[in-house]
Amino acid sequence: MLAEQNEKRFTAALNCLCKNISRRLLPLAPKLADSVQEIRLRLSRPLALVCPDNTYYLTQNGGLSNTILDGAMLVVSKADIVDTFNNICNYSVYNRQNEIVNGFVTMYGGHRAGICGTAVVNNGKIVNIRDITSINVRIAREHKGCADSFYNKIIAVSGGVLICGAPCSGKTTVLRDLARLLSTKGKKNVALIDERGELAGTASGKFQNDIGMCDVYDSYNKSEAMLHAIRSMAPEIVICD
């Protein structure tokens, strides 16, 4: 069941990429779905697939290599970057501008694409990113039960709790499962502040992830969402990423 779910999510993330890349990776989905954490597109560099134990590179014939082989790798083109960027923005870049200036775009299902390029600055503030050279697609996964060991400890805490860890260590995955447990098993009123859309994975008002009985503030600024929640939703617990 988990393997099927991971493959479905991985395939959904691949469909956000340009066709030139997605069509080469789709046949590898059953093999890669459980392990790939990130898909990294770097202009004029080989396509990289980041796994917990290693980084692999896609060859032109659809194979994988853990070393870069001269002349054999699939090199990311400018068209690949542009097409992927437009795709992850649903061909509505203007509507995603608030996310873009913060260096990321959240996609359907909670997958997130980090963006790197040249900053357009006005009065000391970044107002846009142009000439994008790197896109990092982080695969969102659900692992129900991963927060079981934390639940009993956290439910007894009076005060705040900070969960920290290295990048890709599973913080968001654990936090999502905690939200589910606290709002169902714990029967707490939980306000879930999902500023980047990674926890609930909201798409057109529908949650793509199981976040239990939480009240979700999707794409809100954290401070504003907290004020709204406290004023009107009477939360016993406020969760943010």
What does each model-found stretch correspond to?
Residues 1-109:
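N-terminal accessory targeting/assembly segments
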Residues 87, 91-158:
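P-loop NTP-binding catalytic core
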Residues 163:
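Hydrophobic anchor at the beta1->P-loop junction of P-loop NTPases
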Residues 167:
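The conserved Walker
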Residues 171:
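Conserved lysine of the Walker
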Residues 174, 178:
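Hydrophobic positions on the alpha1 helix immediately C-terminal to the Walker A/P-loop
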Residues 182-229:
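P-loop NTPase switch/communication element
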Residues 229-240:
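Proline-aspartate-enriched helix->loop->beta-strand connector
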